[in-house]
Regions:
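An N-terminally biased module of ancient metal coordination in phosphate/nucleic-acid-related enzymes
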Residues: 1-73
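Extended substrate/RNA-proximal surfaces in nucleic-acid metabolism proteins
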Residues: 52-134
Length: 134
C-alpha cells in the first residue's frame, strides 16, 4: 500500500496560516497518511499537532526547518525526530528568534517613515509565541 506523506509543512507558528490542528485536519481531508510539522526554528506547535492526531488519523512526524549559517551562507535544513530540549538547539532557536525580532523592528522602523505603523501593530498579528516575519 502506498502511503501519502507531506514531509514539509508549516503552521501559523512559522510562515503558514493554519494552526497545527487545522493543518492535520486539512491533511486528513486531502487523503494524506502522514505529515511532518517543520515550522521555522521552533517546536512550539508540536503538542497541539500531537493532540490532533487522534481526531484526524494522520500520523505526525515532529521536525523543524532550521536556519543554519556558515561562512556567510545561510541554508534551511529540514530536521526530524530530534530532542527539542537539546541545549544547543534551544540556544540556536532562541538566537534565531531574537535575530528575527531585531529584523522586524528595523523593517517596521523603515516602514513607519511612510506609513503609520508601530511594532506593537505588527505584534498584534503574530500568534502567541509565534514569529514575526516579513
Amino acid at each position: 500500500m502506498v502511503k501519502r506523506i507531506d514531509p514539509h509543512t508549516h503552521s501559523a507558528y512559522s510562515d503558514g496560516t493554519d494552526t497545527p490542528a487545522q493543518l492535520l485536519a486539512i491533511a486528513a481531508q486531502a487523503g494524506l497518511d502522514t505529515i511532518a510539522l517543520t515550522d521555522h526554528d521552533t517546536t512550539i506547535g508540536w503538542d497541539e499537532a500531537a493532540d490532533a492526531v487522534a481526531d484526524t488519523g494522520v500520523s505526525l512526524i515532529r521536525g523543524a526547518e532550521m536556519s543554519c549559517s556558515s561562512s556567510g551562507i545561510t541554508v534551511h535544513l529540514l530536521a526530524y525526530l530530534f530532542d527539542p530540549a537539546s541545549p544547543g538547539l534551544v540556544d540556536n532557536f532562541r538566537r534565531t528568534r531574537e535575530d528575527r525580532e531585531t529584523r522586524a523592528a528595523r523593517m517596521v522602523e523603515n516602514l513607519s517613515a511612510d506609513y503609520p505603523i508601530t511594532l506593537d501593530d505588527v505584534l498584534a498579528f503574530a500568534p502567541e509565541g509565534g514569529p514575526v516575519g516579513r
